[in-house]
């Protein structure tokens, strides 16, 4: 029998080779957890002691989840996908990554889900990187005051409730009052700026649909395509059929895509349609995660849900590229109750609100903007000088008209000044009507509102106002340089006012009413033209007892 010999040199060399060939990166540990229970898009997981808040985790079937509640013995997880296959005891692993979405210009013209995946059947999207959903909003020193206009193309808004780039302007009203229509009109109105090729004018648009019907989202996409606006628009869709977790995340996905452009020095318009449904989805998620409910069963941090989202809309300082993201959140009220929990929260966060009234909508006043209680707190500094000059008294005149109109119902005999004021107000109200998907360029708005406030329409029958406006603008396009000068200068000079005055007076001589009569004869039959000092003065009449 051969004698077993052990050579210390061989052992030393073997150990040395092993140590030299050791690669620490190949040896790793993985935290593994198990599903305790799952249902309604929520799973409770045991294990994973090192998991981070908002970290992505993977289930054994490949489905992703988002860690939310980090408790002592378990984790509450939002399932990001189909949750029917997730069962008790299923293995769960960490990814070490927080939730993020791909970003870049490849998203323009596309429809994506809340995870950034394309759902329009047009293939993969070329991305420029990824951006975390939960990023801090710009700080105070990173911002600049709002000073550039964001024109909607809607006369009532651009004249009396102006919006600036970087502003958060709430659109609030009951269902079926035209909230989405205002948002879509604003997107369509950016087409001229996009086609100009000037990066300082171009606005990239994001429409976030939260809990909408699939047919509604399809009709919005169709309207944008028909208007040629889809090429600079991204739609983030989380329809009503999606789990509550997706509806909760959709606005953050849209803002992450927009922030990428904003920090790149570009201008962005983002529409959240609507945040009421996001709050309801967050309430459902929170209750399923067993968080303590508060007022109306919403969790205690529902204010923070919207404030951290809307604070991302900003006008950045010149040092950061001077980009901007303008937010138009939409809130749906019930029976015009703006004092409910979510509406008051969002009103306090935003820089102004546009109230839409169902009574005005049903009275065929569309867009149904209630100018008396709508306000823009910062947009006045961004308003174009020409429209600011002609619309200075418009809001006051309409408010006086409303109060006088209510009084006139009970008055059997009104003095001449009150009758003239009622006539002027009726024409101004008619002038602010506008068809859907037909935004007005700012120079056309200036001419229309100038004609209304200066009494140029006082002789025109109310039923002919919109036709008069349409034909007047066509006449100015064909026969004068007024509109091109207004577009170029954006200032109402004395020469432009004189040219407008002459052009409008000339057109009135040619215009015929719907009855085929010359305008001059109709005006003299009905009432005398109103004097500015009479119309601008509100009269109060006291009856003797």
Curated annotation (Swiss-Prot):
> What is an example of a Pfam family matching this protein?
ATP-synt_ab
Q: Which reaction does it catalyse?
A: ATP + H2O + 4 H(+)(in) = ADP + phosphate + 5 H(+)(out)
Q: Which key words tag this protein in UniProt?
A: ATP synthesis, ATP-binding, Cell membrane, CF(1), Hydrogen ion transport, Ion transport, Membrane, Nucleotide-binding, Translocase, Transport
Asked whether the UniProt record includes Metal-binding among its keywords, one would answer: no
Q: What is the membrane topology here?
A: Peripheral membrane protein
Cellular component, GO annotation: plasma membrane; proton-transporting ATP synthase complex
What enzyme category does the UniProt record give? Answer: translocase
Record flagged with keyword GTP-binding: no
Q: Which residues form a coiled coil?
A: none
| Binding annotation for ATP | 173-180
Q: Name one GO molecular function term.
A: ATP binding
User: Which compartments is it annotated to reside in?
Assistant: Cell membrane
The EC designation for this entry is 7.1.2.2
**Site annotation (Required for activity): which residues?**
374
- Its job: Produces ATP from ADP in the presence of a proton gradient across the membrane. The alpha chain is a regulatory subunit.
- How is the quaternary structure described? F-type ATPases have 2 components, CF(1) - the catalytic core - and CF(0) - the membrane proton channel. CF(1) has five subunits: alpha(3), beta(3), gamma(1), delta(1), epsilon(1). CF(0) has three main subunits: a(1), b(2) and c(9-12). The alpha and beta chains form an alternating ring which encloses part of the gamma chain. CF(1) is attached to CF(0) by a central stalk formed by the gamma and epsilon chains, while a peripheral stalk is formed by the delta and b chains.
Matching PANTHER family? ATP SYNTHASE SUBUNIT ALPHA, MITOCHONDRIAL (PTHR48082:SF2)
UniProt similarity note: Belongs to the ATPase alpha/beta chains family.
User: What is the protein name stated in its UniProt record?
Assistant: ATP synthase subunit alpha
Its source organism is Clavibacter michiganensis subsp. michiganensis (strain NCPPB 382)
The organism that produces this protein has a lineage beginning with: Bacteria, Bacillati, Actinomycetota, Actinomycetes, Micrococcales
């Amino acid at each position: 029998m051969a004698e077993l010999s052990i050579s210390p040199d061989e052992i030393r060399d073997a150990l040395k080779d092993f140590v030299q060939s050791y690669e620490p990166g190949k040896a790793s540990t993985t935290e593994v957890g198990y599903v305790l229970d799952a249902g309604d898009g929520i799973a409770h997981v045991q294990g994973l002691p090192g998991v981070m808040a908002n970290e992505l985790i993977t289930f054994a079937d490949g489905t992703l989840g988002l860690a939310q509640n980090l408790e002592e013995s378990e984790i509450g997880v939002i399932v990001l996908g189909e949750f029917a296959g997730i069962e008790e005891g299923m293995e769960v692993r960490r990814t070490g990554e927080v939730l993020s979405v791909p970003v870049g210009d490849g998203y323009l013209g596309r429809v994506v889900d809340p995870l950034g995946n394309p759902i329009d059947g047009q293939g993969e999207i070329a991305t420029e990187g990824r951006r975390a959903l939960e990023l801090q909003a710009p700080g105070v020193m990173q911002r600049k005051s709002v000073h550039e206009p964001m024109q909607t193309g809607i006369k009532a808004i651009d004249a009396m409730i102006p919006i600036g780039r970087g502003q958060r302007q709430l659109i609030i009203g009951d269902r079926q009052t035209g909230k989405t229509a205002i948002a879509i009109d604003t997107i369509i109105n950016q087409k001229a700026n996009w086609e100009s090729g000037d990066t300082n004018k171009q606005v990239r648009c994001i429409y976030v649909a939260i809990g909408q019907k699939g047919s509604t989202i399809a009709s919005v996409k169709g309207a944008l395509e028909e208007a040629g606006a889809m090429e600079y628009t991204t739609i983030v869709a989380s329809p009503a059929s999606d789990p509550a977790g997706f509806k909760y995340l959709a606005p953050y996905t849209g803002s992450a895509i927009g922030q990428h452009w904003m920090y790149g020095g570009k201008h962005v318009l983002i529409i959240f349609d609507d945040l009421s449904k996001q709050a309801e989805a967050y309430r459902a998620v929170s209750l399923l995660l067993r968080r303590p409910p508060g007022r109306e069963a919403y969790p205690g941090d529902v204010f923070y849900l919207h404030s951290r989202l809307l604070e991302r809309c900003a006008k950045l300082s010149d040092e950061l590229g001077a980009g901007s993201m303008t937010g138009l959140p939409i809130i749906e009220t019930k029976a015009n109750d703006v004092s409910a929990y979510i509406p008051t929260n969002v009103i306090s966060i935003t820089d102004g609100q546009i109230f839409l009234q169902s009574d005005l909508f049903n009275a065929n006043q569309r867009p149904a903007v209630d100018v008396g209680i709508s306000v823009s707190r910062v947009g006045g500094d961004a308003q174009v000088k020409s429209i600011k000059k002609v619309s200075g008294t418009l809001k006051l005149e309409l408010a006086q008209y409303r109060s006088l109109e209510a009084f006139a119902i009970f008055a059997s005999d009104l003095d001449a000044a009150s009758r003239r004021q009622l006539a002027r107000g009726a024409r101004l109200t008619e002038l602010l009507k506008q068809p859907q998907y037909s935004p007005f360029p700012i120079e056309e708005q200036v001419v229309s509102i100038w004609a209304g406030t200066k009494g140029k329409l006082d002789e025109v029958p109310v039923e002919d106002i919109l036709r008069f406006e349409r034909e007047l603008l066509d006449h100015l396009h064909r026969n004068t340089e007024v509109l091109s000068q207004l577009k170029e200068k954006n200032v109402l000079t004395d020469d432009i006012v004189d040219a407008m005055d002459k052009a409008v007076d000339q057109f009135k001589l040619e215009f015929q009413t719907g009855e085929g009569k010359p305008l001059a004869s109709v005006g003299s039959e009905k009432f005398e033209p109103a004097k500015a000092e009479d119309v601008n003065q509100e009269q109060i009449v006291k009856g003797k007892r």
